[in-house]
Swiss-Prot record:
Species: Chlamydia abortus (strain DSM 27085 / S26/3) (Chlamydophila abortus)
A single GO molecular function term of this UniProt record: ATP binding
GO BP: any one term: lysyl-tRNA aminoacylation
Gene expressing this chain: lysS
PROSITE patterns: AA_TRNA_LIGASE_II
Protein name listed in UniProt: Lysine--tRNA ligase
SUPFAM superfamilies: Class II aaRS and biotin synthetases, Nucleic acid-binding proteins
Length: 526
């Protein structure tokens, strides 16, 4: 049973609704269809901020440039015959001045009992979206201002804005009602503008490197490409159970078999797992593959891409400073090459454990001492899984500077080539880390179809013993494609949300997602 939204009962909503009715009673449309021909505030500032425009008297005489803008009114103060407001357009604000003898209100009847300046003072509210036509000038303090000739009400706001000084202090509200967060915070708007720019820069960089952007299905008959729990849904038209993809990897490799040598995809993936500071069930990823290269070349690709992004966003500098870390402000240089270290060496260097000197029983004892993991998760685990668990517990958080951690245990993935040294217990996989966060996952891709089948069948045997494990099913079409022939290939996946976190100094993944996953409110439940 649905209940009436609480805001409909609030005094401010009722007061603004009364104003709305009064505006309609004046014969005005508070929600017009269009307001064409506007110029952005950003473009106006770029063109006129350094020009000698003149003063308010020049503007009153219409001797200064005329402009037309639209935006949300976020500040208003009345000063006798004049009133001043700030208009927010995208991420830019500009001051406008209403004058009792000069400014008019579009659509206000000439015989209305209320004057234009009184209409502006009494009927408009902070949050209203206005169209402004008027003349530019500089105030005595040098502030670029528009003397309003005509103001048009483009949208009446019925809910008040957050306090301009306090902003939105409640994180729950910020994430649930991101539109308020965007209105209230310049910093939040800049973060999301930067996110958009980052994705554009990635596309431009990949295109310049000769990669072709492709699209693969989000709904899959067989999920794979990662070890994760999928979301399951039903395709009614085919009476078939399907999965939201946990990775585009398998589909992308099928395209490589078809003869396209360099491809990438930017898109959503879905993993039905936990939510924390760096994880959201729905997230954006770039996966890219190139033939005739290995994981050494991929490391170079990845660090060059990230260095390029840092330079583009940071006026050519490769150094970013982070303020939210436990150890205080830290400056990090992203200039390539990054530190490269095997997983075993990283455990020895950062964790103080030389795994080659310890048997499996000893590794389990070390895990028990240093880990909060339940014992059953590792007491019967193979050696490779123990090494990977030790890395997670002892090393990850200490990788503040950019690192490539290479040569992972074979148990961590079935989709990667073994080390060319002949050690079948480890694979040519690397993960890139920064600020204690995993940023990238990459392989020398396994292209031997017979070896691939063996590894996948081994996983299925383990899944039969542990149905709750995250091993993905065998995709026979994928194995058939590999039999057709996949050239030597290197590939990588980068979580764009985490990358944006790193590039914007964000402490949580929720700060870089417009609408992160949130628990349903009681009022939203049936």
């Amino acid at each position: 049973m649905s209940t009436e939204a609480e805001y409909l009962k609030q005094e401010d909503f009722l007061h603004r609704s009364n104003k709305l009715r009064e505006i309609v009673d004046l014969g005005m449309n508070p929600y017009p269809y269009e307001f064409p021909g506007t110029t952005s505030v950003e473009d106006i500032k770029k063109e006129y901020i350094s020009q000698p425009l003149g003063n308010s008297e020049d503007a009153t005489n219409k001797e200064t440039p005329k402009v037309k803008i639209s935006g949300r009114m976020v500040l208003f103060r009345s000063m006798g015959k004049n009133a001043f407001a700030q208009i927010l357009d995208n991420d830019q604000k500009i001051q406008v001045m209403f004058n009792r003898d000069f400014s008019s209100v579009a659509g206000l009847p000439v015989d209305a009992e209320i004057s234009p300046i009184k209409f502006i003072e009494k009927k408009l509210d902070l949050g209203d979206i206005l169209g402004i036509e008027g003349y530019l000038f500089f105030t005595h303090s040098g502030e670029l201002t528009i003397l309003v000739e005509t103001v048009s009400l483009l949208c009446k706001s019925l809910i008040s804005l957050p306090d301009k000084h306090a902003g939105l202090s409640d994180k729950e509200t910020r994430y649930r009602k991101r539109w308020l967060d965007l209105i209230a915070s310049d910093e939040v708007r800049q973060t999301f503008l930067k996110r958009s720019r980052i994705i554009k820069l990635i596309r431009h960089y990949m295109d310049a490197q000769g990669f072709i952007e492709v699209e693969t299905p989000i709904l899959q008959n067989v999920y794979g490409g990662a070890e994760a729990t999928p979301f399951i849904t039903m395709l009614n038209a085919l009476h078939s159970e399907v999965f939201l993809r946990i990775s585009p990897e398998i589909s992308l490799k099928k395209i490589l078999v078809g003869g396209t040598p360099r491809i990438y995809e930017i898109g959503k993936v879905f993993r039905n797992e936990g939510i924390d500071r760096t994880h959201n069930p729905e997230f954006t990823i770039i996966e890219a593959y190139a033939t005739n290269i290995d994981y050494h070349s991929v490391m170079t690709y990845v660090e060059n891409l990230v260095e390029h992004l840092v330079c583009e966003l940071n006026d050519g500098s490769t150094v970013l400073t982070y303020t939210h870390l436990k150890q205080g402000p830290v400056s990090i240089d992203f200039k390539a090459p990054w530190i490269r270290m095997t997983m075993k060496d990283s455990i020895k260097t950062y964790g103080g454990v030389d795994v080659d000197l310890h048997g499996d029983h000893e590794l389990r004892k070390i895990l028990k001492e240093c880990s909060s993991l339940p014992e059953e998760s590792y007491m019967t685990a193979p050696r490779g899984s123990l090494i990977a668990a030790l890395f997670d517990e002892l090393v990850c958080d200490k990788l503040i500077a950019p690192h490539h951690i290479t040569d992972h245990p074979v148990e961590t993935t079935p989709l990667c080539k073994s080390l060319r040294s002949g050690d079948a217990d480890f694979v040519e996989r690397f993960e890139s880390f920064c600020l204690g966060k995993e940023l990238c996952n990459a392989y020398s891709e396994l292209n031997d179809p017979l070896r691939q089948r063996v590894l996948l069948e081994q996983q299925q045997a383990k899944k039969a013993l542990d149905p709750d494990s995250e091993y993905h099913p065998i995709d026979e079409e994928f194995l058939e494609a590999l039999c057709q022939g996949l050239p030597p290939t290197g590939g990588f996946g980068i979580g764009i949300d985490r990358l944006v976190m790193i590039l914007t100094n964000a402490a949580s993944i929720r700060d870089v997602l417009y609408f992160p996953a949130m628990r349903r409110l009681e009022s939203e439940k049936d």
